């Protein structure tokens, strides 16, 4: 039962963070659907910065990059009228029973 409680507490704080990010985006005036193409570029920029940090083995920059990537994806989802948690749940439901094999540290689906 402890793991379920931890998951619930983590999920609850993740939900709060999502709403904080959405509120921040609204305050900055970047919450509108017409901004989605520009926001997608921000997502790609942050993922690219994360890749650069990973290649340099810079742990703090990796953590920052992953966090920034989350933020930009949350904003993009909200701009498109999507709930980030629902997007994650849909992806999880798609992959949870997926079969395949792992080669060189990468999972390859059947």
Write out the residue ranges for each language-model feature.
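Flexible "arm" and connector segments at domain edges
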Residues: 1-66, 70-110
């Amino acid at each position: 039962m402890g793991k379920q409680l931890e998951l619930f507490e983590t999920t609850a704080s993740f939900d709060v963070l999502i709403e904080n990010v959405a509120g921040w985006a609204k305050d900055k005036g970047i919450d509108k659907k017409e901004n989605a193409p520009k926001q997608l570029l921000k997502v790609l920029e942050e993922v690219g910065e994360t890749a650069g940090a990973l290649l340099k083995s810079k742990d703090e920059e990796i953590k920052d990059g992953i966090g920034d990537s989350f933020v930009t994806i949350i904003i993009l989802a909200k701009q498109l009228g999507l709930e980030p948690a629902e997007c994650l749940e849909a992806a999880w439901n798609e992959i949870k029973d997926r079969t395949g094999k792992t080669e060189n540290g990468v999972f390859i689906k059947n």
